[in-house]
Regions:
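Conserved aromatic/hydrophobic "specificity hotspots" at molecular recognition or selectivity sites
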Residues: 1-2
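C-terminal transmembrane bundle of multi-pass solute transporters/carriers
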Residues: 7, 14, 22, 28, ...
């Protein structure tokens, strides 16, 4: 049944240190993502002084980071390995959100958001590639579904928490997101230790 297959995916995920850690990182990163992005339109208006057109330009500028991230992810992983590429990307996510929480300059905010999206693309590509190499082919769909559930729960939690924090200070969700990503970077260094890339290639 569907539930039995889902349970099998969860059990396998929980029993594998690296893939389970990637799922945990994905859930936490989803919280960190939704903390600022659940209130980004309000942040852009109240903190950056942007109207609807300006907000659109801000998002368009941030998308450039995604293009850059897709271009550099594979070379970075080949040079640094999955562990340090993922950790560095998550650290960049933390730094970009910390800067965004402090700035009131729309141009600086656009650059920081582009760096944030760059981190998200690099982290996602590396994590997905590593997971696909480590999970047996017959379990890939079930384990992937279990990981997506963890991420969806993180999105829901981050959205609710972001809205609650914004009622006291509009920049607070962004700062909280930076803290979450800093924790994710530290967790990645610890949890992905060992020859994870050689294990994936085996």
């Amino acid at each position: 049944s569907v539930f039995r297959e889902a349970a099998e995916g969860v059990r396998w995920l929980a029993g594998h240190r690296v893939v389970g850690s990637l799922a945990l990182l994905g859930g936490l990163a989803s919280v960190g993502y939704m903390l600022p992005f659940s209130v980004l339109v309000l942040f852009a208006g109240e903190r950056l002084g942007l109207d609807a057109a300006g907000y659109g330009v801000l998002l368009a500028a941030s998308a450039l980071g995604g293009l850059a991230g897709s271009a550099i992810a594979a070379p970075l992983r080949a040079r640094l390995g999955s562990r340090w590429t993922i950790a560095a990307a998550l650290a960049l996510g933390a730094a970009s959100l910390a800067g965004l929480a402090l700035t009131r300059d729309p141009i600086v905010a656009g650059i920081l958001l582009a760096l944030y999206i760059l981190h998200a693309v690099v982290w996602s590509i590396c994590a997905t590639t590593l997971r696909q190499r480590l999970v047996p082919a017959d379990l890939l769909g079930r384990v992937g579904a279990a990981g997506r559930v963890v991420s969806l729960l993180g999105l829901a939690a981050g959205s609710a928490l972001g809205g609650a924090l914004a009622t006291s200070e509009i920049a607070l969700p962004t700062l909280a997101g930076a803290v979450v990503f800093a924790g994710c970077a530290a967790l990645a260094v610890f949890a992905l230790r060992g020859p994870v890339d050689r294990a994936a290639a085996a």
